[in-house]
Structure formats: C-alpha cells, structure tokens
Amino acid sequence: MGEFINVLVSKGKSNLIPEKDNLYGQFVGEWDFEWVDNQGTTGERHVQGEWIFAWVLEGTAIQDVFICPSRKARIKDYQPDAAYATAVRMYNPNTEAWDILYTELGGATQLEGKREGNRIVQTEINEKNIQWVLSLI
C-alpha cells in the first residue's frame, strides 16, 4: 500500500496550474466543520464533520475525504445519512476550470468548478444545473 500512497499523494501544486486558477490549494490540510441541515426550520440539525484535502497525481489534482459526522462524533452521534465520501478535483487547462467527481456510497456527482468573484461555484453537470457554492472562505 505504501507505493500506492507514494504515487498518489504529491508534495504540492504542479506548475501546469496557473496561480490565478489555483482555487482549491487554500484548502489543503485538515479541517473541522459544522454541517447545518434544514437551517431555519424545526428540523434544523448541526453535525460536526471533518474535511481533509491533499494534492494528488503529480500536483494536477486535489483529492478530499469528506467525513460527516466526524470519526469521533460517529461513535456517539449516529446519523442515518452519514457521509464518508471523496472528491477528486482535476484542473482542466482547456477550460481553465476544475473537473470534479464527488462520490459516496450509493452515488456519484460530476461538477465543474470555477471562480465567480470571491466565491468558488461548482456547477453540477446534468440537466438541472445545480450549484454547490463555497463561500465565506
């Protein structure tokens, strides 16, 4: 398994990614977050999670592991819709955007990530054009 990790994980960003398009490099590392579901309703819930990001594939992509509830919280706070998921974001020099594949048990989603002002907007590639917006960064 050690060789797999050695060829997957990279020390940093590839020079093939222009700095202006380095949208996700700021997230490399380990993060704790609070997931708020059904905000403002009687069903509102708050769940602690983890999000871990690393450069991969010679620094041309960023992969993350999304864990919600967090590994620690999963033991005492079972959630029936818990996620232990991963996403790979690979820079596409032809579109100057990021091709993204998010997958978890039971499904996968393809998105395209671009900067819009001071936000990162990830548009789902399907007939619905759903957007996942990363803001307040």
Language-model features and meaning:
Residues 1-137:
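Hydrophobic small-molecule pocket/channel-lining residues, especially in calycin-type beta-barrels
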